A protein has these predicted regions:
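Short, Φ-rich (hydrophobic/aromatic) sequence segments
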Residues: 47-53, 87-91, 143-145, 195-198, ...
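Intrinsically disordered, low-complexity segments enriched in serine/proline and basic residues
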Residues: 6-7
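Catalytic core of non-heme Fe(II) oxygenases with the double-stranded beta-helix
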Residues: 103-184, 189-192, 196-203
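Non-heme Fe(II)/2-oxoglutarate
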Residues: 14-113
Length: 205
């Protein structure tokens, strides 16, 4: 894999030379996931983990447990605000990296239109045997996973067939149309917050 460091410490992990459509423009070209390590993990982890333990009671297709959906304006704890504000502060840079191989008109748009907002999020708890079947988050343009707890043996996140090992305190941002899955976990305790980000563009909402 090729590792390229953007200015604020994130990095790209995919080797686009292995992708079937890597020389084609648009949605058939490679959208590279971008990874950041959160400087606030030690401060926010315990309250957010407890929030998931208390609310993850819906069994998803694949076996994992999830909370209900929350909007980006829902901040049940101060730690939610810390995490959401941090994620939103990174999105413009991350999208610039993700879109660089896509021939997207976004790359030529003015900086004043490059505005994003965290649209929704939910907590996930993976007990032994729990996973998530192959799916995507389209029509959201950007999706993310933030990993709060990843015991040894935790299943990776697989995006477009590429396996990304998850690590505590790590944020993975990727294009919402990208198919992804989590294999059945061999152990219990894998916890994360997933969500989607909307592109505001020149709108005022």
């Amino acid at each position: 894999s090729r590792w390229i460091n953007p200015p604020y410490g994130g990095f790209f992990i995919m080797d686009i030379s292995k992708l079937k459509y890597n020389k084609l423009p648009g949605l058939t070209s490679a959208f590279e996931p971008v990874i950041y390590d959160c400087p606030y993990q030690d401060k926010i982890a315990d309250p957010l983990l407890q929030w998931i333990y208390d609310r993850a009671n819906v069994r998803v297709n694949g076996g994992a447990l999830k909370t209900k959906f929350y909007t980006g304006n829902d901040r049940d704890t101060p730690e939610h605000t810390i995490l959401i504000d941090w994620i939103e502060s990174l999105v413009v840079e991350a999208v610039q990296g993700m879109s660089r191989w896509t021939n997207s008109a976004y790359n030529e748009s003015p900086d004043s239109s490059k505005k994003f907002k965290l649209a929704d999020y939910w907590g996930m708890y993976y007990d032994q045997g729990g996973g998530a079947v192959l799916h995507n988050h389209w029509p959201y343009p950007i999706s993310f996973g933030y990993y709060l707890k990843t015991p040894e043996g935790s299943s990776p996140l697989i995006i477009d067939g590429e396996s990304i090992q998850v690590t505590e305190g790590r944020l993975i941002l990727f294009a919402g149309h990208q198919s992804h899955e989590v294999p059945e976990c061999e152990i219990s305790g894998r916890c994360m917050i997933a969500g989607n980000i909307s592109y505001k563009g020149v709108t005022d909402w």
